[in-house]
From Swiss-Prot:
Any one Gene Ontology BP term: protein transport
NCBIfam families xrefs: acc_sec_asp1 (TIGR03713)
Role summary: Part of the accessory SecA2/SecY2 system specifically required to export GspB, a serine-rich repeat cell wall protein encoded upstream in the same operon.
Keywords: Coiled coil, Protein transport, Translocation, Transport
Protein name (record): Accessory Sec system protein Asp1
Assembly and binders: Part of the accessory SecA2/SecY2 protein translocation apparatus required to export cell wall protein GspB.
Mutant lacking the gene: phenotype: Loss of export of cell wall protein GspB, the protein accumulates intracellularly in protoplasts.
Amino acid sequence: MYYFIPSWSGSGKRVWHRDIIPWYRSMQRLEFDDTIHQIRIFHSENLPVKLLLQAYMPHARYFLHRQDIFETEYYSVFDEIQAVESNDMQVLQIKDLEWEDDCEFIYTPFLIIVRRQGQLYAHVEFGVEGFISFIKFFKDDQLEKLNIFDDRGFVSSIVYYEDGQEVCQDYLNPNGDWRIREYLKFENSHVVVNPVFSRDFDKLEYECMPDLILEKLGYYISHNVEEDSRFVVAAQPFTNQGVLDLLPQHSHSILSFFHERNQASNIENLKADLEYADLVLTDRMDFKETLQNYFPLQAEKIHYLSPFDTRLQLGKSQQRHESKIFYQIDLSELLNDYAIFKVLFYVAQHPDTELVIGVYNAWQEGIKQVENKVEELISDYLDLKDFIKKSFKNNQAENPLPENQELEYRFRIRNITDELSLIQELDDTRLIIDLSQQPNLYTQIAGISAGIPQINLVASDYVTHLQNGYILDSISQLAVAADYYLQGLKNWNQALIYSIEKIKLNTGHQVIKRWEKWLKEAIDEK
């Protein structure tokens, strides 16, 4: 049996607490990672796997569903802590909750505002899938408490506030009784156990939450896992020894690195981790070489495995007459006027192209910034008429004068809020352009998974020049690179075939065969 221990953590200091955000504020980082890719591989081969979840994830079922791994069996540390036994999901409606008779409900496009006696009483916030995610309660316009809902239909935890600052968080069982209380003020942070449930814990007080998490995870592993099991541990950015020390003596461990998560890792701190693991996987060739150079004694156990996202379909853009270009802009970098102009100029010169400018998880002002820049460049250097796709009559107008015509243009700006929205956008895309100093990782993974050629300024493991993409020496070469893939089918088909061959090397059967071979070699070396 393979057990996967993911790193689905929060972005703050309390990494064990998964970020709880409303649907209109999407995460500023990828959800897709190495663990998700690996589990899908095992599912494709109908091999049994189990997830061991360390993080507090009250919306875990929706997360697993979004990533197409909902059927995966799992053990959750916080389900153990909170005595949650059922995995049946239940969608709560606003009417299912108890409210005072004088509550007034105001429905907005984003959330439900609740008022009592003319005063703000609560904000009801929703997740991406439309379920009640959390409710903020206010007193005298100050945040008083935050109820976080489990996607199985109960209040999972309550965060209490004083003067707008977090004081403590109670983690509840499905009956609403608090099981543990986490004190959140920096100078007094610790965890206490409700004495009523003392028999379920080794101690009544813990110095920090990770101590309790490791206690529960260690107990589960020691009582439920066979000694010769295989553990795939997603490498944490800082240390992995706490988890690795819990693994049975005769089990086999695989340590998996993912660039998006581990780019801040201090190489020097990884020595003990690499010595312990039987096999080490990385998603980037350059990081593999770095580890091998830094730890030559462990070099033979370090291997490169490229992730793909099997939710994408190959080659669907051939069904479109127009060539759709997806141009990724990274708002963490300064807008490159010249790059945007060159892309717009190419589209203006080629009437059979359409342009989608994709911005990842942008706030409204970020979208506006891109819109203003596009309008400015077209106004100063191009002709808006060159971008007209079609015009049609405005049904509200009384006469067919030109000024009453609605115009549709061959470019639009799209805010990419998550991986699924990018997948939908790439479904019929012909060419990806990303001229950032650090190309978006998931866009590159999605591009090769869908067989779409990509134009970049920077070389990477995912794009090979003139095979499945074009690496520019300078932005001035953009038109040459775009023509290479859009003028005729030969080069585009070659990129598709290259992607197919690369994906074939990473099908479930091939990957698992390699894993077993690498593991055997590593174990034999011991």
